[in-house]
Amino acid sequence: MSKIAALQFPTLALSESRLDYYLKASKDNGANLVVLGEYVINSFFTELLHMPKNMIKEQSEAKKESLIKLAKKYELEIIAPYVSVEAKSYKKLCLKVTPNGVKSYEQQILMPYEHWNEEKFFSNKTPSELKIFTFNYEKIKCVLLFGFETHFDIFWQQIMAKKIDLVIVPSACTFESKQRWEELLKTRAFLNSTSILRVNRIGKTKDEWNFYGDTLFINAFGEIESKLGSE
């Protein structure tokens, strides 16, 4: 039976000791794939807005090096959302780190809201043709979507057409949205005959944004089989 470890964290410190501990525990418990939520490798979006570029770059590069090192050390695949610092901008990516290398998925649709305007901050380009990022894990056909992208039918049409087994969704859901997210993802799973693993962030920012966790696995019948709390 294939196992996947969903690690529910706030933003991690630059030290890799905590990540090392939980990756080892994941491997010891039989998981070969580990998934992190959004803004765990990096500070949360509202904090990035006020951070110097060199500090964001240091944070990103140090964490990426740790992921590469630990993936090799424990022979793991690791999925981790990541802020890439470009020459004149930033991009919001999700890394898929394996012992053999790194692939990245660039988020295709970003949040445009006044209080959370990723579309303005990041330089990601929306391609004329949206395509899902697929990979196989122990004979399971997987797709990677950012939380916000789960709202858009175009991705689910492709997921249905390609008969995907599992949709992996790193997220940073906050405010009073817990119930809405559960209902959205249960509906998506049921209507598209696919399982969903949503891995959410926890913690609280300085401006009182509270991330409630609720990492969960939903089967293809739209039923929540397991979920974590708020810690």
Per-region residue spans from a language model:
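Extreme N-terminal starter segment of soluble prokaryotic enzymes
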Residues: 1-5
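Hydrophobic residues at beta-strand termini and immediately following loops
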Residues: 7, 105, 135, 199, ...
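Short polar catalytic/cofactor-binding loops
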Residues: 8-14
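Short, acidic/polar
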Residues: 15-25, 151-157
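Cys-nucleophile CN-hydrolase/nitrilase-fold catalytic domain and related Cys-dependent amidase chemistry
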Residues: 20-99, 103-104, 174-187, 191-194
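Structural motif
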Residues: 32-33, 142, 166
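CN hydrolase (nitrilase-like) catalytic-core segments centered on the catalytic cysteine
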Residues: 56-79, 151-231
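Active-site catalytic loop in hydrolytic enzyme cores
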Residues: 85-162, 176-183
